[in-house]
């Protein structure tokens, strides 16, 4: 919206870059105000001149009007710069008052204006009200002025010396007026004669003339003061206002105007102002000025902005609502923020709102998944959302859900939002048992109906839970029937917690028959809870007709390598289960033989049938896939001994290959500069804070940059994108700190950066798709094949210099041959992907038979399955069901006449496509196994992790 025109006026030899930056920031802030005014259908046009630059800021129509008047811009620039601000003599005012151009007079005027503003604020309005100095000096207890320096009494600014005036302006944020006893004269009335209003400071274009303007004022809602003025006729006497600017160390520029406005104010002391309901037949322009009820917007603004008198003139078609648009937007943002806080609290397992870490969620995609957002609305902090987006979010509130996939870096979710409940002194009351069917078990309120626990003994929480979930069915129980139902539910809870009632001791029966806050039941050890889960897992494993395992390793806080083993199995009903099988500490050697012995021991612990093992997914390290002594080789040998002819499939993780492929681009000359500058900014707190402020003032899209790490390679694309979109800001910031980056001025380097941005964003999109929940191996393979096809397409497009799929590169491309330079890099990337996916090529026919049974060619099917596949392809009933439900649900409807094909599908369905599930476990381990609880035994940690997964 802002436009800058370079003037031909002479430039000062020593210009302050810091002052220019301040001017640029303020113009940017003014531009943001114009955007908000445009949403209210108000038109604004502003011209600012600084040295040789002319800034045009305003709404679309306002800028169009000013841009059409280039002569007006030139005249205004010459007037402001050619003569010099200090040499301009103001025209003689009508009332004969002389306005001095000296420094003291300007400061006195600024102090007087601020006193008027503070006095008006004390009266409950945001407009400036003349201060009754004589009355205040006569009756000093009526109005108290706070914040003045010691030894300085309140008086008219014309009696202050230069040093006192400067001190007042530098510390004006702490000055305030307190009215203990209002004055009853007409001067004190809001809208009385001599009142300084926004209308006095409005400027009419010098090229246009207008007649008197009738101004109707409306009383503020909260002021409690009735306005006496019925109409104000404003006449403009001066065509060319004089603008004075004074820069003082430690303060921002303040402006005053010496234009004189004659006001005719007919007063009626007996009749308050009442808005007329009749249409106005006066051809003169009618303007309504409404007071702003939000005083915080004035007190919290910057010092330089407080001195600016911004007039908003609107012509409403109908009566405005009581709440201003700013208050409505604020309410919307608060409602959306409360919604997000409640949803985030539910995601981390608490029943109260928790402050949402918006920055961490935005800069760490994939850690927290937000489902149910309206189409086209991206999750952001409410302060960055449009009004329409916030309304759509509130309409879809019941569908929005937060899911924590993996912990956010630097955020302990186990401690987020925890309240100091012990300090609240809440006690469970016995009457809540009968009212809401709750009892206290181990000092925790527990619902007798659904066994759900509340974190706090608070009646509101218990009543809300009961009315929301159970009142419909349990309100029918009254008096004696309700007591009997309560006794019955207590027995059910006792059986639920302790199992059979025959084994209970009398003490335990007494605990649950008469629960009280002072009685405590024994705590069930975590090993016992995990033992029950392990027993259920053993039963589930025995029902598997096919299963696969995924193996990965990581080093914990104790510098111990932890080997995680996951199992994925399919039963006869084609129900898929993914469970943690075991975690094994690797304290000795980490050879393939040692890993095999640990895995074999874990499988024996669960009595797993080796003949049903289909595949093993690993990270592809030498200890895993070595042809002689690797883990996969030994597992294949063991499976062959149990089931002759069986072949164990080996799958290398297909999530990590694009990280390795990204290294094949060989663009370290770009990444080194980006990493160096980003880490320099982010690793120093002061630099990071200042850079965030810089981006905020320049109204950039991103508030900060992502900190780049080699381990967290997923951040590569996000870092590059934010770096490219903030090139100008980074260049300016680094240069101002004595760390210039000459590469940012190189066209070739910027072109390489743009290509790397596009390429890494494509790779990140692929990675996020591969990390979906419950992914079938065929779906993941389809995603990789699709990406390979895209690489071929991009290679063809680049030969024609078609940059349709490289939008960032297209922005900086200037020559038709720019795309040709990157064809070899695409070719290398394609070759590397094909090499990494060679394992899947071996099983492509089997995967195709699983995903597309009705379109597979019989010649590509294994001989033992051909007859059943032919029968299947000719079965129209199953074909209809396949088209309706798709895979994998379709295989639940297969009849018993396809036993071999069903077994084949069960094996494919059981395969892991990656070790991503292991990485999720390691995230939980890092979150839980901190330095404060790292001394637990391995068996205890095994139990904890098993319960957590």
From Swiss-Prot:
GO CC terms, sorted: nucleus
GO molecular function: DNA binding; DNA-binding transcription factor activity, RNA polymerase II-specific
Subcellular location: Nucleus
PROSITE patterns (alphabetical): GTF2I
Keywords annotated in UniProt: DNA-binding, Nucleus, Repeat, Transcription, Transcription regulation, Williams-Beuren syndrome
Main localization, broad class: nucleus
Stated family: Belongs to the TFII-I family.
Disease the record associates with this protein: GTF2IRD2B is located in the Williams-Beuren syndrome (WBS) critical region. WBS results from a hemizygous deletion of several genes on chromosome 7q11.23, thought to arise as a consequence of unequal crossing over between highly homologous low-copy repeat sequences flanking the deleted region.
Name of the molecule in the record: General transcription factor II-I repeat domain-containing protein 2B
Species per Swiss-Prot/TrEMBL record: Homo sapiens (Human)
Gene: GTF2IRD2B
